[in-house]
Amino acid sequence: MEDLSAPESALFQGGHTLLPSASFQESVTFKDVIVDFTQEEWKQLDPVQRGLFRDVTLENYTHLVSIGLQVSKPDVISQLEQGTEPWIVEPSIPVGTPGDWVTRPENSITASELDISGEEPSPGAVAEKHKRDDPWSTNFLETCESKGSPERQQANKQTLPREIKITEKTIPTLEQAHVNNDFEKSISVSLDLLTHKQISPKQTSTKTNVKQNLNPVKKEKSCKCNECGKAFTYCSALIRHQRTHTGEKPYKCNECEKAFSRSENLINHQRIHTGDKPYKCDQCGKGFIEGPSLTQHQRIHTGEKPYKCDECGKAFSQRTHLVQHQRIHTGEKPYTCNECGKAFSQRGHFMEHQKIHTGEKPFKCDECDKTFTRSTHLTQHQKIHTGEKTYKCNECGKAFNGPSTFIRHHMIHTGEKPYECNECGKAFSQHSNLTQHQKTHTGEKPYDCAECGKSFSYWSSLAQHLKIHTGEKPYKCNECGKAFSYCSSLTQHRRIHTREKPFECSECGKAFSYLSNLNQHQKTHTQEKAYECKECGKAFIRSSSLAKHERIHTGEKPYQCHECGKTFSYGSSLIQHRKIHTGERPYKCNECGRAFNQNIHLTQHKRIHTGAKPYECAECGKAFRHCSSLAQHQKTHTEEKPYHCNKCEKAFSQSSHLAQHQRIHTGEKPYKCNECDKTFSRSTHLTEHQNTHTGEKPYNCNECRKTFSQSTYLIQHQRIHSAEKPFGCNDCGKAFRYRSALNKHQRLHPGI
């Protein structure tokens, strides 16, 4: 195969050898291969023809630069690269005499030659000029049409000069172009863009306008790739194509040394360094480096989605998105990792995956020095620092800092779940969730922790787990300074300060801070309890709730406190317990300033100020502030006391009451005051005791504004205002405000 990368190869196409003539001896310049238009001529071209002119002109210039025949960049190239239209003033050089052809620019084609004016030159002058100027005359064609052996072609190559001169006279007519359709367009004016007016000795007049001359000519694809068999009309296109096989990238960026196989890709890349974005959107003013990027962006405003999937009818604004989408139906995964063999349907996902093996994170945040594998991830991360949320939901007005987050949120309103599991039929709104779910069927856990050997189904789970070993907490709350290991934890924590509850139940309107809480709540409407305990038959909505419940029967307490060694059945109980040692109370009451270590305790405490008692007994109508208090009260109607003490056989309605009672027998007092070392059997007793040291009286009477250090004192005091006497004597019916008063009274009756 001949060397198509050599500059001289452009002169040996399809077996035709282009021999130099006397007029070829000067060096080629860009003026020799550019077609000039007047303003009037340019206006007559439609957008397709102008685009064709732009593409061919830039390609011709690129090839001149690649073989070292052009140094300075002409203004017209700069204009075309910037997307502006070149308005070339019509030359004022007279046309008509042979001497005029010497002084007139050789590449300029005027209105008279293109018949734009509608005037016809004399037939004799046309025939004579055609014969004199035609480079494809009989003698010349005889030379070019000699097929020639490889030895003959090699001899011709050796005799060819390095620099050649191509003038307007070397441009073939359309008729001749069909005969010699392999003449290299990379060093001549494109045969498809603009050709000489076709005039033969038999033809006396021809009226051809610019638009007709610029119509693309369907030509034979005679340049064929030996590697894959793909054919091209021009061998310059074949040369570019062959670089995909050879990996050749001759165009190198001086700034970052990145190389490209095509010059236009280098030009577009250099705009990253210069910041040049010549393509502006008329709607929003956003700038783009490339014209196609602008076209794709404008579809956001127009809503145009011209690419439609034949399988499901889904439409896309970009063809690449359609191609990627179709792989969902075909299951095609053409990108395979050489390290672990994992396959991907999208090249971007494949490139991201490879960075897991290399550890490469080239994109760094200037604010916090955090690094990322993708520039888009860095851009989204930076919005955490700026607070920018550019994507707004039209349904609820909520704003998001990333498009993917916005799209996921929008599916909450539409209920769309396009990704379905083939195993169990469960549907998901995100493809990543489907991928994660499928691992529950396969049991696959490909991500191993190097520290402890624990395996995970997801890379994100491994990344979160690693923070346990490193203790890293990069996400900090601006309000209270608390730090978190995960961004999601910080987002959830912020809702404590903002009181935001974005997740609302469509059935009853109740709102929740977390989506998981909403999902749990919604099951109360459906009453779906699919998980049943084999020991006692109790059913639960979630499998995790069943697992926790089963610990009652097994006595398992897998969560241990490192400070005091106490064990717990639930992780949440351990977290709450640890706050006793740390003294942490992040939940503060705005009314009285009292702080709590749990949010639920703050919620319950606020009812003291508001007087709210949302839990009402269906039997007697009595209302309570806490759900647990209602549950305790209801057992007075049923007399149910399932928890028995092994020491004294006393029965209790709650297991917590039994645990507290058993401390009487054991003498255990696990709650110690840091001020005076006094110990208590209950944490509530310790809390109330600590108020004696601080002088704090957080419980206020709404009637007289009197304050108390303990809630029980406030409850007893409020009976003065309400005249409530809940403790009645069974013998005489007399009622008392306090239990102690009832006990004293009962001693007056005989037999007590």
Swiss-Prot record:
Alphabetical keyword list: DNA-binding, Isopeptide bond, Metal-binding, Nucleus, Phosphoprotein, Repeat, Transcription, Transcription regulation, Ubl conjugation, Zinc, Zinc-finger
Xref: InterPro entries: KRAB, KRAB_dom_sf, Krueppel_C2H2_ZnFinger, Znf_C2H2_sf, Znf_C2H2_type
Zinc finger (C2H2-type): 223-245, 251-273, 279-301, 307-329, 335-357, 363-385, 391-413, 419-441, 447-469, 475-497, 503-525, 531-553, 559-581, 587-609, 615-637, 643-665, 671-693, 699-721, 727-749
A GO term for molecular function: DNA-binding transcription factor activity
Any Pfam family: zf-H2C2_2
GO cellular component, one term: nucleus
Keyword Transcription regulation: yes
Cross-link Glycyl lysine isopeptide (Lys-Gly) (interchain with G-Cter in SUMO2), sequence positions: K207
Disulfide bridge partners, by residue number: none
Function: May be involved in transcriptional regulation.
Family under the similarity heading: Belongs to the krueppel C2H2-type zinc-finger protein family.
Protein name, UniProt field: Zinc finger protein 184
Organism: Bos taurus
Gene coding for it: ZNF184
